[in-house]
Each structure stands twice: as C-alpha cells, then as structure tokens.
Amino acid sequence: MKVLMFGWEYPPHVFGGLATANYGISQGLHAQGDMDITLCLPKPFGDEDRSACQIVAMNAVPIAYRDVSPEYVRERVGNIMDPDLYFRLRDHLYADFNYMHVNDLGAMEFAGGYPGNLHEEINNYSIIAGVVARTLDYDIIHAHDWLTYPAGIHAKQVSGKPLCIHVHATDFDRSRGKVNPTVYSIEKNGMDNADCIMCVSELTRQTVFNQYHQDPRKCFTVHNAVYPLPDEYQAIPRPDHTGKDKVVTNRRSEERFSRNDE
C-alpha cells in the first residue's frame, strides 16, 4: 500500500510531540514490509532519517512555473529533496499562483515550527498539497493533526482516495476548554471529510464524537506505541521496596513560612 502522509515536523528537529509520533508511526508502518510512505514536510533540513519514508520538501514544490536547469535545482534543494521530483511536480501545476510570495523556484518558503503566521502557513501548505496530490501515486492519505487537515482534504478532493486523519489532540485538550473557533473549524472540517479518524486515546475518541459530532463508527482508538527497553536497561537490578517501614521528614508549612517572614 502506498501512503501519502502529511506531517508538520520530524526528528531530529523536534518542536513538539508531533515529531516523535510521526517518526514512530512511519517506522512502524515501514516495518510491516508492505507499506510505501511518502511524507510531506513544510521545511525539512536534510538530516532527517529517510529509512522509512521518502520526504517531499513542501518548500521546494513549485506552485508557479520557473524555467530553471536541473543543475540549479540540484544546487538549491538537492540536500532536502530529489531534484528530479521537482520537475515531475512542475508538470502538474494546476493554477497560476504567481501572485503569491514565491521564490526563484516558484516555491513558497516556510518558517518551520509554529510561527506567528501559522494559519497562513497552513493555508500555503494545503495549496502545495494540490500539486503533490496530482503528481504522486498513492492509495490512501494520512494527515497528522489539525495543521495538515486542509492539505489532506485537498488531496482527497483531487484524487478521490480515502482520507485518514490522526487526532493527536483536539483544541479542547490544548486549551483546557477555551477553544479557538478558527482551530475548531479546521479540526471539524477535517473530521467531516475524513473516511477514518484515528484517536490516540479513548478519551480523545469520546471528545471527537461528543464535541465534533462525528459518527463513532468511523472513529478508532489507536494508542501511541512505546519502544521496549534495551536488554542492558532491563537487566539493571531494581531496588527492593517490600519493606513496611517508611520515614517521611518535613517541616510544617506554618513553620517554614514563619521563618521566611523573619
């Protein structure tokens, strides 16, 4: 199976927990032996582990035509993406985006991480996804968290392929209930258009169909995996905590505060 995966960060450049989760999922799917993963990242740096997936640098995907040579493309983006892919992508431009802020390759730059203009970058990412979706061959679309839901929706609209979104957290979790209406709208739109919703916990799954009004039949709990400890760590003797006597020493709060006031 060929997977077109949209992510926002990837080790070793970790801005949050999403990078680690994305890496683990990519490695886990690759280990199945029958998965071909293409991972789209807004700003890869070239030192990412590519053993489990091919990486598409979204900041090197043209959305406007530029007459450039293979040598120039290799010099500019050869360290982050296969230069031949640039020309394949350029053959699938679907609109004239010269009015946008594009560079000498006809591509848009990304700050990386979570900049102040995050919503603008999310929109730009989804525009670029349209070129990628028209170029590559894939069977299913996997979008990680709300940042990439618009890109996943665009790819589904272009290809008709099923969309699986991965809910690592909802804005109800991140904001402790003080939900940003713009973020909520993006999240709900992603869920409404998804064929499958993967939730990292049963609590998240309950939030998805209670707060976002989704059909429970398309919501699945898929817990994050853990790496087993190496044998040398498991062999370390553990302290014996079978004793009954416990001694706890501390000063009373009143005493501590009264001394601080002196």
Language model: regions and residue ranges:
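Active-site proximal beta-strand in glycosyltransferases
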Residues: 3, 140-142, 149, 153-174
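A conserved catalytic-core segment of Leloir-type glycosyltransferases
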Residues: 28, 34-133
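Nucleotide-sugar donor phosphate/pyrophosphate-binding loop at the beta->alpha transition
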Residues: 118-128, 162-164, 172-189, 228
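Membrane-proximal helix-turn-helix segments that form the acceptor-binding/catalytic region
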Residues: 130-135, 157, 180-197
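Carbohydrate-associated surface elements
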Residues: 203, 225
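Conserved donor-binding/catalytic core segment of Leloir-type glycosyltransferases
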Residues: 239-254
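Conserved small/polar residues in nucleotide/adenosyl-binding loops
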Residues: 255-262
